[in-house]
């Protein structure tokens, strides 16, 4: 199966509240929003773990909503892994394999996914004889992903799969999830962690009290000041980039990004490697003329397009901060400034300015 489109229309009433959503996505579709927004309910309905009042579910041209859960071929990974404690790792994996229908694994391309390949990719081959109670949190999640994959799913539904892991364990698993996405396995991914969204998402669905506030590509959602204000202090644009070269004598790597060059601390990546970068709005300085001697490496010509008030959690009343959208040749940045700065600098749509960014402020999300 190719990286197929996902279509969801869902309505369900709970006592005192209602979830009513309609969205479509490509590749990895991330459901993002605060607690109580309806993310997990949507994931459970798609996976067939609850029966909503109304559901339309289409994955890769296949209508799945009329099928019972066991025939939808949807692999599910939860926050707490939910492995069978009385079975070994091998027993848990074999449980997933027994649920797989006959036929080819649905992934496309030259990405082999036999049982052995899955275990190698997830790094769980040495764990087969162990019981879940003896595994670390990261090991349990890798086994849970392997069990889901061995069921030969049409897609994966992942509900906060990394929420209980420390940062090091997250960094072990995120590249595996990106490889699965690149291999063509559609995902519905629930999270409230911006880094996970930035690393994995193709499309993002912003949820708020059971409704879709906005949906679209990661690049659009992350660089729209009207939407990114909801990310609070973590607002920032996510951009696709390619390693174009290195300057080891200066400790820098050159990235081709959004039609311009961005310098970051030296990366151990080959030229031509594709990756993503996240540039926090709080780390972007807006200038109307080029500064003199300065430690900043990145001085990028941009065009101011629009701005919105920055709604920050924990700040009451009218905020005096704003998110300004800045156009690059092939994308957009966000900058957090004060309203006073907008007036002082005469920032208005169409104004040519400079975006100043420290190289160490660019969050390189990896290949």
Curated annotation (Swiss-Prot):
Keyword set for this entry?
ATP-binding, Cell inner membrane, Cell membrane, Membrane, Molybdenum, Nucleotide-binding, Translocase, Transport
Give the matching Pfam families: ABC_tran, TOBE
Q: What is this protein called?
A: Molybdenum import ATP-binding protein ModC
Family per similarity comment: Belongs to the ABC transporter superfamily. Molybdate importer (TC 3.A.1.8) family.
UniProt catalytic activity: molybdate(out) + ATP + H2O = molybdate(in) + ADP + phosphate + H(+)
Top-rank taxon of the source lineage equals Bacteria
The record's subcellular location field reads: Cell inner membrane
Describe its function.
Answer: Part of the ABC transporter complex ModABC involved in molybdenum import. Responsible for energy coupling to the transport system.
The subunit structure is:
The complex is composed of two ATP-binding proteins (ModC), two transmembrane proteins (ModB) and a solute-binding protein (ModA).
Q: Which NCBIfam families is this protein grouped with?
A: modC_ABC
Q: Which residues form the ABC transporter domain?
A: 1-234
Q: Where is the Mop domain?
A: 293-366
Q: What is its EC number?
A: 7.3.2.5
Q: Which GO terms describe its molecular function?
A: ABC-type molybdate transporter activity; ATP binding; ATP hydrolysis activity
Q: What class of enzyme is it?
A: translocase
Per the record, its GO cellular-component terms are: plasma membrane
Topological type in the membrane? Peripheral membrane protein
UniProt: ATP binding residues:
33-40
């Amino acid at each position: 199966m190719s990286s197929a489109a996902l279509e969801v229309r869902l309505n369900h009433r709970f006592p005192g509240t209602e979830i009513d959503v309609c969205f479509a996505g490509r590749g990895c579709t991330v459901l993002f929003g605060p607690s109580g927004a309806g993310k997990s309910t949507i994931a459970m309905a798609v996976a067939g773990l609850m029966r909503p009042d109304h559901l339309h579910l289409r994955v890769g041209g296949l209508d799945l909503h009329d099928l019972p859960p066991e025939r939808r071929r949807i692999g599910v990974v939860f926050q707490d892994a939910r492995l069978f404690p009385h079975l070994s790792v091998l027993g848990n994996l074999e449980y997933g394999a027994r649920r797989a229908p006959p036929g080819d694994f649905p992934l496309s391309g030259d990405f082999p996914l036999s049982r052995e390949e899955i275990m190698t990719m997830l790094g769980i081959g040495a764990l087969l004889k162990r019981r879940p109670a003896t595994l670390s949190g990261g090991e349990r999640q890798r086994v849970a992903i392997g069990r889901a994959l061995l069921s030969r799913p049409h897609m994966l539904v992942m509900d906060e799969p990394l929420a209980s892991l420390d940062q090091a364990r997250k960094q072990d698993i995120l590249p595996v999830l990106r490889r699965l996405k690149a291999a063509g396995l559609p995902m519905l991914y629930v999270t409230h962690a911006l880094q996970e969204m930035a690393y994995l998402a193709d499309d993002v669905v912003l949820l708020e009290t059971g409704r879709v506030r906005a949906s679209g590509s990661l690049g659009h959602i992350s660089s729209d000041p009207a939407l990114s204000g909801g990310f609070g202090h973590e607002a920032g644009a996510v951009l696709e980039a390619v390693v174009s070269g290195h300057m080891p004598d200066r400790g820098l790597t050159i990235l081709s990004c959004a039609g311009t060059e961005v310098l970051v601390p030296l990366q151990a990546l080959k030229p031509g490697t594709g990756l993503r970068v996240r540039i926090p709005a709080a780390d972007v300085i807006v200038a109307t003329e080029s500064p003199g001697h300065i430690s900043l490496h990145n001085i990028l010509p941009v065009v101011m397009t629009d701005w919105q008030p920055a709604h920050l959690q924990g700040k009451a009343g009218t905020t005096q901060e704003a998110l300004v959208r800045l156009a690059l040749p092939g994308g957009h940045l966000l900058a957090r400034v004060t309203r006073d700065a907008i007036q002082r600098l005469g920032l208005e749509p169409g104004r040519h300015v400079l975006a100043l960014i420290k190289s160490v402020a660019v969050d390189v999300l990896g290949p």
